[in-house]
């Protein structure tokens, strides 16, 4: 949550997230404590100079042990976004019994919840990333616990914004500033 967002941006983001994050009896309240992201924001909720940014995240635990992360991504006003030039990286981490943190080997599912994803309405687009815990059949499954996430948004192969919870994961697993061109 970003308490210093302008009221209009906060209202747009809340409206979109409220439609998608109606609580279910099996879910827990969103967690945002210990989240780390870029602290410097302009009046649009974006980092100065960024084309896209994360304006909110919502995290819930599900009854089956999976975790859902809702990510609200906003574009700078009056800039036409080419969705093919945008990449979102979502990394979930686990901790073993010795306290070692590692990238999950479980399948991570992502789904855009607000198609078409084009930022033409000047409202945040919503992405859901789902972490599924290791299957009990996995030999290491009982030794692993969910640790947290790191999210990075890239536009034209350049980092635009990041979020991590706990924040130490971003320090321990820094994202590259630029992605290699896919040409």
Task: Mark where each language-model region is.
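Compact, basic/aliphatic-enriched, mixed alpha/beta core segments that act as assembly/interaction modules
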Residues: 1-8, 95-97, 103-106, 120-126, ...
